[in-house]
Amino acid sequence: NTIRVVPTPPKTKFSKVWEKNCTDLGLASRNNTGLAIYGQYLAVQEYNGPIYLYDMKTGAAVKTIDAARSFMMKARTDDAGHLITSRENIYGAGFMVFYYSEADQEHKLLLDYTAGDGCPGDLGYNMSVAGDVTSGTAYIYGTGPNDMTIYYWKLQDGQLVTPANQPNKLRYGPAGSSWTAAPAIQRASLADDSDHYISYTKWVNGNSDEALKSRFNIFTTSMEVTALNAAAHEYRLLGFNVFKVENDTYLALNDQGADQWAGGGATLKVFDITNTSKMELGPDDDGYGDFCVFTSDMSAWGQNYFSWGDVAVYKEATSTGYDVYICL
């Protein structure tokens, strides 16, 4: 009998493609609140400013797109690759969501939830989409600070099924009390009984109480919760993105510390959450290295009073597998 030992290459391999700060990118300010990978572009939404497009693979500036309205906050892409941007309800501006039409080179209105119709203040401070907003079933989600409620709308073939002024409301009881910053929310699928991913924080500047630390959870329609061990990340979660590569599911997290000056170093962490039972693992547990497949070097200290941060992911097939680009 012959025994052969065949080495198994790692499932994932990570490398830094480029790194630039706001000055390097030519951004007018540090108030950059939305991030999306839009085709071959990295799209950066400046708060109450334009959308800057960069070459995703080099960081080279390409062009600028005027914002749809004032107080534009977030940038996302839907499942079909459309660029989606949104305005938060500040100064009674209302929560508005648009997609950008390349053909017409203009923003198309998808949702206008006005303050006069009862839109809560600051709703839209965070936003996400699921599906293709122009065809078939899609969803728009909006969240705000100092709340426990997630608001969402269903669309069919680009039209609202849920009236703009009558959003579906999902109260997230497992939070226990109101979050202080608008949570990030992601729908797992378009199925009616889809799970959801959420990260939220109750952090108050100057307070390092462990009970206020950010949490990342998966929850079902019946509010069964699978929680990521909070020891696996820094004090604040700024943003996340859950993505699939064939049959595997990965979680990309942007986290940051929180000192008395609302600052700290930040990292990117990637977890293999295909087997969700591993989410209970902490850094000192056996098997953690196979669960947390990547941790970046910690960034220099940065102040981040509003806990702004985003994670954008783009996947493309290659001759040997997939290249996945993660930007934050």
Residue ranges, per PLM feature:
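Loop/turn-rich, solvent-exposed surfaces of beta-rich toroidal or solenoidal domains
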Residues: 232-301, 309-311
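Short coil/turn segments that connect the beta-strands within blades of beta-propeller domains
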Residues: 39-40, 80-82, 135-138, 194-196, ...
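Repeated scaffold domains used in trafficking and secretory/extracellular systems
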Residues: 27-36, 67-80, 86, 115-133, ...
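Asp-box/WD-like beta-propeller blade repeats and closely related beta-sheet repeat scaffolds
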Residues: 100-148
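Beta-strand-rich domains and repeat architectures in extracellular enzymes and scaffolds
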Residues: 20-49
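C-terminal edge beta-strand
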Residues: 1-8
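Structural motif
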Residues: 49-53, 91-99, 145-157, 204-217, ...
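Beta-propeller fold detector
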Residues: 11-23, 61-69, 105-118, 160-175, ...
